[in-house]
Amino acid sequence: MRLTDLEDLTQYMSLDTKLLVQTEDFVNQVTAIKYANNHSDIILLANDQTNAMTLSQLFARLRTLPANTILLTENNQPIFGFHLDNQYNIIFK
């Protein structure tokens, strides 16, 4: 998923929306980001020990990046989309 796609799909959502990522059968909270090895894409880091990052925190950290930046999971797989849970948190897949 490109950064611009995420912005377009979430433009009417609350900026307090929490971010989660699903890998296989587990759903963990997105707690940090880091650059991928190519230094242009972003990896979403998940952890269940701390508070989940919100949509506003993610956009604040990524605001200087190009719109074509790709979002990746921790195992460097591209994120293809997301769905909402029953509390309207974003779960990336």
Describe the role of every protein-language-model region:
Residues 20-93:
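Detector for the mature cores of small, proteolytically processed
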Residues 1-18, 23-24:
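Long, hydrophobic N-terminal alpha-helical segment
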